[in-house]
Amino acid sequence: MNTYTFDEIDIGKKESFTVTISEEERDKFRELTGDVNPLHNDLSYAKAMGHDRCVAFGMLSASYLSTLAGVYLPGKNSLIQKTEVNFRKPVYVGDTLTITGEVTDRNETFKLIEVKVDIKNQNGEKVVKGKMEIAVAE
């Protein structure tokens, strides 16, 4: 876990990590949220909707923004204030995602950083685009 302070974070600073979406993660997310939409766990339904496989929950992919802020950038000293997320392409169970955050702005007065987030799949396709405003505790 990183412990960057506000003064250690410059515009352009980047951090990234990689995860693979497993069936177990999908099932835990479904149990946690109660979202039983068949697109996520009924292959015949997913195929009828034009997908080759069951679609992973979009918010499961988006939940990795919390990991990005809380573990990597800035890490321990973070408190997310605002998020924006755009889902660009479906994510499927078995996909390997690379989550990258880059600092695009700093607010010295309020000790806030703005982080642009891109999530790409194993084919390099951008599946999620987002932005976070994060307070950095001292």
Go through each PLM region and give its residues.
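HotDog/MaoC-like acyl-thioester-processing domains
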Residues: M1-K14, Y92-E138
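Hot-dog-fold acyl-thioester-processing enzymes
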Residues: M1-S78
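Charge-rich, low-complexity amphipathic helices
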Residues: H51-V55, L68, N86-F87, V91, ...
